[in-house]
Amino acid sequence: MESILITGASGFIGSFIVEEALKRKFGVWAGIRSSSSREYLRNRKIHILELDFAHPNELRAQLSGHKGTYNKFDYIIHCAGVTKCTDKREFDRVNYLQTKYFVDTLRELNMIPKQFIYISTLSVFGPVHEKTYQPITEEDSPMPNTAYG
């Protein structure tokens, strides 16, 4: 059975991805903060992995412990991040820097998955095709109009 780690698994998007991964018969690991709600993660087939992205040494220990027992993940979908905050520097700290810590740690521990998917936000594109509702494509230029995007 292939394994998948879904970070931000207790969030809106992450919890739906967890359910889909279970339907597709993956071994599912839900990467969450210790303070995260587990309300949508009650299925006994879900393995909980507490991850502290804010502290690289702690994150390294958590991932290293997993590797020692289960090896690496086949796939990782990274959707942990903040969508709202009072200080716009928090977006950079959490959504960029902590993601960098995560990827750097995976490399350092030789835990590179077959595929790593980073879930960002439509806010990156700003109001592209807002009136016509045309699909956003790779050719569209990002035009973020908020610190979040």
Language model regions located:
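Conserved acidic residues
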Residues: 2, 72-74, 114
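NAD(P)H-binding glycine-rich loop region in Rossmannoid oxidoreductase-like domains
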Residues: 46-97, 101, 126-127
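Conserved Rossmann-fold NAD(P)-dependent oxidoreductase catalytic core, especially the SDR/UDP-sugar
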Residues: 100-146
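N-terminal Rossmann NAD(P)H-binding glycine-rich loop of SDR-like oxidoreductase domains
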Residues: 4-24
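N-terminal Rossmann-fold cofactor-binding loop
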Residues: 31-36, 52-53
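SDR active-site strand-loop-helix element
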Residues: 7, 31, 76-80, 116-122
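Residues at the starts of beta-strands that form the adenosine-phosphate
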Residues: 3, 27-29, 115
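Short loop/helix-cap segments at secondary-structure boundaries that form the rim of catalytic
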Residues: 37-44
